[in-house]
């Protein structure tokens, strides 16, 4: 009996990691490469962020926090949405995650049943289909054209929707 689940066996090696590693190898031999792999910033963390982190650590703010975000962070997010987007939210409507992919994966795991379809317009982030597969769903890729700014058209979306469609990434 294998220790690896059947779900994990369906996942392919990460193209993002492969292209990132290839770029590193080429740079190491002196090639001028523009990396289009992992989304690492090409700049150092700004000093105000470093200083805030140091201050928090020195102030003893080193323990686990609420999984969905601290009250202070939620308050800052609410303020941002009100000021910049004129949107009103309560703290119960705000959930913080470690990144967009993690939040999407959690949503898929919480809501998809085996065979549920998720419409994914292409081009897309390479992880999306595997995230859907791990959650038991079926990715349904819809190719988008440059002439449409690589956005799914209402007609293409309508054609992609079936009785098994449960989610649409946009």
Describe these PLM feature segments.
Residues 134-140:
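A short helix-loop-beta submotif of the ANL/AMP-binding
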Residues 110-132:
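Conserved PLP-anchoring active-site segment centered on the Schiff-base-forming lysine
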Residues 2-99, 106:
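N-terminal small-domain helix-loop-helix segment of the aminotransferase-like
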Residues 140, 145-170:
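Active-site phosphate-binding strand-loop segment of PLP-dependent enzymes
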């Amino acid at each position: 009996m294998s220790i690896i689940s059947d779900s994990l066996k369906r996942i392919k090696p990460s193209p993002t990691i492969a292209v990132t590693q290839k770029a590193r190898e080429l740079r190491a031999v002196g090639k001028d490469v523009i990396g289009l792999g992992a989304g690492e910033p090409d700049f150092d963390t700004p000093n105000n962020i470093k200083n805030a982190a140091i201050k928090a650590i020195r102030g003893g703010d080193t323990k686990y926090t609420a999984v969905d975000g601290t009250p202070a962070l939620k308050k800052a997010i609410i303020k941002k949405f009100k000021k910049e987007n004129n949107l009103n939210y309560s703290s119960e409507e705000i959930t913080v995650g470690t990144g967009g992919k993690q939040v999407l994966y959690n949503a898929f795991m919480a809501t998809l049943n085996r065979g549920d379809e998720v419409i994914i317009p292409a081009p897309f982030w390479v992880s999306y289909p595997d995230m859907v597969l791990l959650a038991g769903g079926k990715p349904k890729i819809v190719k988008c054209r440059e002439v449409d700014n690589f956005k799914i058209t209402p007609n293409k979306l309508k054609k992609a929707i079936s009785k098994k469609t449960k989610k649409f990434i946009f």
